[in-house]
Amino acid sequence: MTTRIDIRFAELAKQGRSAFVTFLMAGDPDPATSLEIIKALPKSGADVIEIGMPFTDPMADGPSIQAAGLRALKAGMTLKKTLELVRGFRKDDNATPIVLMGYYNPIYIYGVDKFLVDAKSAGVDGLIIVDLPPEEDDELCLPAMKAGLNFIRLATPTTDDKRLPAVLANTSGFVYYVSITGITGAAAADSSAVSEAVARIKRHTKLPVCVGFGIRTPETARAIASHANGAVVGTALVDALKNSLDADGRATAKTVNAVAELTASLAQGVKGAQQAAE
């Protein structure tokens, strides 16, 4: 199978540049504004879009993304509405890859088979499920692959050479390397450590390696993108969104632009990595 993710990374490889991957929470701060923001991302330079599935117990998320999930849940966001959001995005954009990121519980409650059918028909390309290890591939990973979706796995600084083959075995689309141990948004990524880690992962796989956690500025994005096939930014974009809201946590006239402008700035950083290499 070839997905939009595979096509996008092949296109970028031909251009000799890394992907800029954005993360935002579905339904933050409300479903309508969320769709407007996500539609603005590709125009601002996003190559791949990760969309968080709001969940009440997000153990890997830092305070910013946890708060985004709570705002979305308060606004009535559900997994069904998250798929509707993707469907709405696909009306105008059939090329930009969409990855849903989150936890297994909401999918399990929705029903795995139903979810996979609905996700595929909505226009989802891949899944990142942070609390399903390789030992549980039968639960969702293998059915997702059969349904034509990429299953993207996380590798971390503590994933050693003994563990890495198991992590990579059924991974497709790309590998998501978590550059720091801990929760999202905690610290800055170290580009020299990232360089070594990406090289180590690439000894085990031909898949693109994207790096996330700890990228907040165009400078860091550029440094990371020079070592990896993609740089993922989430917390910084979620913070820009939050800082544009009114005192009651509602969207303002500035909200969409606040996220779009930071996206454009970070995208320039990622694209600068290619120019620096030339």
Curated annotation (Swiss-Prot):
Reactions it catalyzes: (1S,2R)-1-C-(indol-3-yl)glycerol 3-phosphate + L-serine = D-glyceraldehyde 3-phosphate + L-tryptophan + H2O
Pathway note: Amino-acid biosynthesis; L-tryptophan biosynthesis; L-tryptophan from chorismate: step 5/5
EC number: 4.2.1.20
GO molecular function terms listed in the Swiss-Prot or TrEMBL record: tryptophan synthase activity
The entry's keywords: Amino-acid biosynthesis, Aromatic amino acid biosynthesis, Lyase, Tryptophan biosynthesis
SUPFAM superfamilies, A to Z: Ribulose-phoshate binding barrel
Classification via CDD domains: Tryptophan_synthase_alpha
UniProt record, GO biological process: L-tryptophan biosynthetic process
Keyword DNA damage assigned: no
Pfam family, one: Trp_syntA
Disulfide bond entries: none
Catalytic residues in the record: E50, D61
GO cellular component annotations of the record: cytosol
InterPro entries linked: Aldolase_TIM (IPR013785), RibuloseP-bd_barrel (IPR011060), Trp_synthase_alpha_AS (IPR018204), Trp_synthase_suA (IPR002028)
HAMAP family according to UniProt: Trp_synth_alpha (MF_00131)
Family: Belongs to the TrpA family.
Description of how the protein assembles with itself and partners: Tetramer of two alpha and two beta chains.
Record's function text: The alpha subunit is responsible for the aldol cleavage of indoleglycerol phosphate to indole and glyceraldehyde 3-phosphate.
Matching NCBIfam families: trpA (TIGR00262)
Protein name, UniProt field: Tryptophan synthase alpha chain
Organism annotation: Bradyrhizobium diazoefficiens (strain JCM 10833 / BCRC 13528 / IAM 13628 / NBRC 14792 / USDA 110)
